[in-house]
UniProtKB/Swiss-Prot annotation:
Any single GO BP term: biotin biosynthetic process
Organism field: Akkermansia muciniphila (strain ATCC BAA-835 / DSM 22959 / JCM 33894 / BCRC 81048 / CCUG 64013 / CIP 107961 / Muc)
Entry-linked PROSITE patterns: RADICAL_SAM
Radical SAM core domain sequence ranges: 44-273
Coiled-coil intervals: none
Entry annotated with the keyword Nucleotidyltransferase: no
Metabolic or biological pathway, per its Swiss-Prot or TrEMBL entry: Cofactor biosynthesis; biotin biosynthesis; biotin from 7,8-diaminononanoate: step 2/2
GO MF assignments: 2 iron, 2 sulfur cluster binding; 4 iron, 4 sulfur cluster binding; biotin synthase activity; iron ion binding
Description of how the protein assembles with itself and partners: Homodimer.
Family: Belongs to the radical SAM superfamily. Biotin synthase family.
The protein, known as: Biotin synthase
């Protein structure tokens, strides 16, 4: 029996894989690995697929120096800069996605963390959306206190998003203005406040396969059931502008491994999907069962209409409101 088959049987039986086993699994034949990851997805999650959307609620002028990010004030990029959008603009985005059956809508803001005034304004916006629209609300506002998490939850937010981005080992190579532990603390506070959490990373930041496994194992250890997988889109003007994007085989291998790490949740494909020739079709048969649809924060995405058509062809049942 191959290593892939052996670990598949264990996971289907409710077991888990060690770090060393996952590293070895990452070197197994790709087709068998992807088929096994898809079998795990079917066993634990069926054909349910989760689509969400995001809106860039405040853009640019971020104090942080994340080397991949177009919104960092440390780099000269062509990103549009604007302050926090109005209640009506944020509501319009929610209504647009709600009308298309999208289950979740997230407001994302640039910046290291929110001020008390920012939180008050955003909570008013979340309440305004909740009063006029039935879409589920997510929030992504950087590092955040437990008190602010509690305020967001009271305003109608059900899930907080905060990516670890990369492994503890690689993090200082990517960002020096905040730490891996800062992000872990934010996640823990969100969980303590009663919010669900969505957390993953960006692939293609110079990390190793071991780094990827370490990061997703850290996330899984927190009980998180929504794990985004982003693929770097190099942005002109950033230090990572000349990074070589990952190839299809490596992308598929990563997604399959995440499914082995988290058998029963949503492996969510996010940034970088628009650069794939098939817009993620192979990945959605290799363990992934969720995606961000529409545009990303500063890059183009795949339209909701295209996603719904493709997922129907693949036999998925998209979670709708």
């Amino acid at each position: 029996m191959s290593l892939t088959s052996s670990l598949l049987s264990r996971v289907l039986g409710g077991g888990s894989c060690s770090r060393e086993e996952l590293i070895a699994l990452s070197r197994e034949p790709l087709e068998e690995l992807c088929q096994a990851a898809n079998a795990i997805r079917e066993h634990f999650c069926g054909n349910v697929f989760d689509l969400c959307t995001i809106i860039n609620g405040r853009s640019g002028k971020c104090s942080e120096n994340c080397k991949y990010c177009a919104q960092s004030a440390h780099y000269s990029t062509a990103v549009e800069e604007y302050p926090l959008l109005s209640d009506e603009a944020l509501l319009a985005g929610a209504r647009y996605n709600d009308a298309r059956g999208i289950l979740r809508y997230s407001i994302v803001t640039s910046g290291k963390r929110l001020t008390d005034e920012d939180v008050d304004r955003l909570c008013a916006s979340y309440r305004h959306i909740a009063e006029h629209c039935g879409i589920s609300l997510c929030a992504s506002h950087g590092l955040i206190s437990k008190k602010h998490c509690e305020q967001l939850k009271a305003a109608g937010v059900s899930r907080y998003h905060n990516n670890l981005e990369t492994s503890r080992r690689n993090f200082p190579n990517v960002c020096t203005t905040h730490t891996y532990d800062d992000k872990l603390q934010t996640i823990k506070w969100a969980l303590e406040a009663g919010l669900e959490v969505c957390s993953g990373g960006i692939m293609g930041l110079g990390e190793t396969m071991e780094d990827r496994i370490d990061m997703y194992m850290d996330i899984a250890a927190l009980g998180i059931k929504s794990m985004p997988v982003n693929f770097l889109t190099p942005i002109p003007g950033t230090p990572y502008a000349d990074m070589t994007p990952l190839g299809e085989e490596e992308q598929l291998r990563i997604v399959a491994l995440v499914r082995f790490i988290m058998p029963d949740g949503f492996v969510r494909i996010a940034a970088g999907r628009n650069t794939m020739k098939d817009h993620g079709r192979k990945i959605f048969m290799s363990g992934a069962n969720a995606a961000i649809s529409g545009d990303m924060l500063t890059t183009a995405g795949v339209t909701i209409r295209e996603d719904l058509a493709m997922l129907a062809e693949l036999g998925y049942e998209v979670r709708m409101k």
